[in-house]
UniProtKB/Swiss-Prot annotation:
Gene name linked to the record: sreA
Organism name: Arthroderma benhamiae (strain ATCC MYA-4681 / CBS 112371)
GO MF assignments: DNA-binding transcription factor activity, RNA polymerase II-specific; RNA polymerase II cis-regulatory region sequence-specific DNA binding; zinc ion binding
Source lineage: Eukaryota, Fungi, Dikarya, Ascomycota, Pezizomycotina
Protein name: GATA-type transcription factor sreA
Database matches in InterPro entries: Transcription_factor_GATA, Znf_GATA, Znf_NHR/GATA
Keyword field: Coiled coil, Metal-binding, Nucleus, Transcription, Transcription regulation, Zinc, Zinc-finger
Zinc finger (GATA-type): 250-274
Gene3D superfamilies: Erythroid Transcription Factor GATA-1, subunit A
């Protein structure tokens, strides 16, 4: 039989070395310490029923068994040194059996100690965030204990739903009355108020914000560092806010609505308007200039901005309908870009409506096609053989001067065909007129009736001296009619224009020159008369 002695008598009977061995932590103490650290890290929740279980009679009985085993070992060491090894083996077997029974109770007793309760208070104190909400430590609970299957009231579905609603409600801001479109009153509510500094300074920074899920799942060490950073931010916010929790007002005008806070030379907080006024004028802005609505640049809201604070009041925003329709078209295009898969989600395979490039078009011969003309063949021949618009060289000008008069007349006609008409109304009334203008008709008329009716009396003796080449119409030329309503007639070309006329004798050449001189004088007089008629017509229209 084993005799039971008190633990104090057992300790007194041991030598000093054995007392030190007894004071060393045992396996139970180490296990209890490990469980305490695990609970402090959020692995398991502390419950009051564990404290009650530690004071049960079973726990007292287990402690008596452990003390009896220790007394048995001490008596065997004192009485029989020969049978010490045998008793140690028995003690080891007995201690192993007692450890299996008393391990949960000893751990419960160690957790119920005052030191454990102090650690529990510190742990619970760390779980409280600045928003006075207790952090749910059961989010990452992967307990390895048998009693961890019991549910915690804080982790119930109703409580979790309430916490989710609280988190979503704290971050949301009430709908404001900002008109938008560059007029800002700092309350928000328009589509462009999401990134407005005045709105953020006044409303958004003062709104309560709940901790995010990432912060709730952080480790204790990371939580400690985040709490320190949050405390620093809270200190800065409290320094820039008054007792009501809103940002401080301007020291000069008292406004709380500004896109940018400034400081004067004394370090006082002033608004943006007062700061700019002080910088430009060197004096503080008068209070009478304070306005409740500030003018800002009109914000261009992206097409897919559907999560802004003012998304619900988009009817009062200043965004054009074209932008709204473009955003709807973009969202519809993104929705229909991929066909739905079998499981209901979008299939990221081949797109249902692939974006194809426009068909290629060859513009190589666009500018090289010849222009088709509806004029007469003789006129086309003259225009095609006419010189270009560039300045002529010396050889070309010399050859033009030495050419026969008929050739020069034809070149004059072809050159004058590119001039704009003087009278657009008469030019439009001429059918099949091509590009010939009234100037060319005035300068190159060959109508005998017109010549006889407009011949000067002083030059009448020289009129019969005209050569046959002047009286006969040139091939491909137009005859002039004094009445602008009657169109000039085109004489048909009987021969090829590439064959030059035969050379003239000197006497005939002098006659041609004299006739040409008289013709030019008559044409100049006719042009003066036509100009006077047009001036009279313009005067009558005034």
């Amino acid at each position: 039989m084993l005799t039971l002695r008190s633990s104090s008598d057992t300790v007194r009977g041991f030598p000093a070395t054995k007392r030190d061995m007894i004071r060393q932590p045992s396996a139970e103490d180490l296990d209890a310490a490990h469980q305490l650290v695990s609970s402090a890290r959020g692995v398991a929740d502390l419950r009051p029923d564990s404290f009650d279980a530690s004071r049960s009679p079973d726990g007292d009985k287990a402690s008596v068994d452990t003390g009896a085993a220790m007394d048995d070992t001490a008596s065997s060491d004192q009485n029989h040194s020969e049978s010490q090894q045998q008793q140690q083996q028995q003690q080891q077997q007995h201690s192993q059996a007692s450890e299996q029974v008393s391990a949960p109770e000893s751990s419960s007793r160690s957790r119920a100690s005052p030191k454990a309760s102090r650690n529990t208070e510190v742990f619970l104190g760390h779980q409280c965030v600045p928003t006075n909400r207790i952090r749910d430590s059961g989010a990452n609970a992967n307990s390895g204990y048998a009693n961890s299957s019991t549910s915690d009231p804080r982790a119930s579905p109703a409580a979790s739903d309430a916490s989710a609603q609280n988190a979503s409600g704290c971050g949301s801001t009430p709908a404001g009355t900002c008109p938008g479109g560059g007029s800002c009153n700092g309350t928000g509510g328009a589509v462009g108020c999401d990134g407005c500094p005045a709105y953020n300074n006044r409303v958004y920074k003062a709104a309560p914000r709940a901790p995010s899920a990432r912060q709730a799942r952080a480790s204790p060490s990371a939580q400690t560092s985040e709490e320190q950073a949050q405390s620093g931010l809270d200190a800065l916010d409290s320094a820039s806010q008054d007792a009501s929790g809103m940002p401080k007002a301007c020291q000069n005008c008292g406004t709380t609505l500004t896109p940018l806070w400034r400081r004067d030379d004394q370090g006082n907080t002033i608004c943006n308007a007062c700061g700019l006024y002080y910088r430009l004028h060197g004096s503080h802005r008068p209070v009478a200039m304070k306005k409740t609505v500030i003018k800002r640049r009109k914000r261009v809201v992206p097409a897919l901005r559907d999560r802004s604070p003012g998304a619900g009041s988009s009817d009062n925003s200043s965004v054009s309908p074209e932008l709204h329709s473009a955003s709807l078209a973009t969202s519809n295009a993104d929705t229909n870009a991929y066909p739905p898969s079998e499981n209901g989600g979008p299939s990221y395979g081949a797109a249902q409506f692939p974006h194809s490039a426009p068909p290629p078009i060859d513009f190589t011969g666009y500018y090289s096609k010849p222009t088709q003309s509806t004029s007469s063949p003789g006129l086309n021949t003259l225009i095609n053989h006419s010189p270009n618009t560039k300045k002529r060289t010396h050889s070309e000008s010399t050859s033009a001067e030495s050419a026969p008069p008929a050739t020069r007349i034809q070149s004059d006609i072809s050159a004058s065909a590119h001039l704009p008409p003087i009278n657009p109304a008469s030019a439009r009334a001429l059918p099949n007129s091509g590009r010939l203008s009234s100037i060319s008709s005035l300068l190159n008329h060959t109508d005998p009736s017109f010549t006889e009716s407009h011949v000067d009396a002083a030059l009448g003796s020289n009129a019969p001296a005209r050569s046959q080449t002047q009286t006969q119409p040139q091939p491909g030329t137009r005859s002039y009619s004094p009445n602008p309503v009657n169109p000039p007639t085109t004489q048909p070309a009987h021969g090829s224009h590439s064959i030059p006329p035969p050379p003239l004798t000197p006497a005939a050449d002098d006659k041609v020159k004299a006739a040409r001189r008289a013709q030019l004088q008559r044409e100049a007089e006719n042009m003066r008369e036509a100009l006077r008629a047009k001036e009279r017509e313009l005067a009558s229209l005034k």
